[in-house]
């Protein structure tokens, strides 16, 4: 049970977090236990965590702020072991270095800074940048469907996550259908058998440029014409030029 001082201090800090949240961080206490806080870190841009959503806990001692909290990260992230106490200068691993003037915001800013670095500690793990990116992409799904505590503490984020995950799924579906329907001849035209600039003979290059301009002119003169047929014509022309050069 929290002391009156801990209760007062954590209540004040929650108000400050709501009014002025740190970048990429939100945090709130468990409604039934003010000593148990939950946080969500959004992966910053230009890091392998970009787009990731990382849920974790801060477990405060009853005599906070005179002793530091235990820090854990629950969402798989590639930087820390899941649901494991982390050895940081502001965690309960180091009560000797703890400063009672530090706050929840200070702790979580420090955690984010350590997360985006490469220093090792008790509770940290080593993974590749690509592995971290893959976990970042999966993190929203994990929090939304695999973490009961996340759903209980952050129901409004769960709703937003579901909407975003549905949007991503539809986007992937649309892209997949587009790739399946694309005319192979049109695709070949876009890939071009040969570039005009690669034609070595100056006279051949001039003739090719003139022929391409004529094709483009004919295409532009037909506003209702088929773009596919235009690309096919260009592809065949460049393919024949390539054969001629061989």
From Swiss-Prot:
Q: Which Pfam families match?
A: UQ_con
Which reaction(s) does its UniProt entry say it catalyses?
S-ubiquitinyl-[E1 ubiquitin-activating enzyme]-L-cysteine + [E2 ubiquitin-conjugating enzyme]-L-cysteine = [E1 ubiquitin-activating enzyme]-L-cysteine + S-ubiquitinyl-[E2 ubiquitin-conjugating enzyme]-L-cysteine
Active site, renumbered: 87 (glycyl thioester intermediate)
- Subcellular localization, per the record? Endoplasmic reticulum membrane
Enzyme Commission identifier(s): 2.3.2.23
Transmembrane portions of the chain: 225-245
Q: Which GO terms describe its molecular function?
A: ATP binding; ubiquitin conjugating enzyme activity
GO annotation, biological process: ERAD pathway; protein monoubiquitination; protein polyubiquitination
Print the keywords alphabetically.
Answer: ATP-binding, Endoplasmic reticulum, Membrane, Nucleotide-binding, Transferase, Transmembrane, Transmembrane helix, Ubl conjugation pathway
Q: Which residues lie on this side of the membrane: Cytoplasmic?
A: 1-224
One GO cellular component this record assigns the protein to is: endoplasmic reticulum membrane
Family the entry assigns: Belongs to the ubiquitin-conjugating enzyme family.
Q: What is this protein called?
A: Ubiquitin-conjugating enzyme E2 6
Name the source organism.
Candida glabrata (strain ATCC 2001 / BCRC 20586 / JCM 3761 / NBRC 0622 / NRRL Y-65 / CBS 138) (Yeast)
Q: What is this organism's lineage?
A: Eukaryota, Fungi, Dikarya, Ascomycota, Saccharomycotina
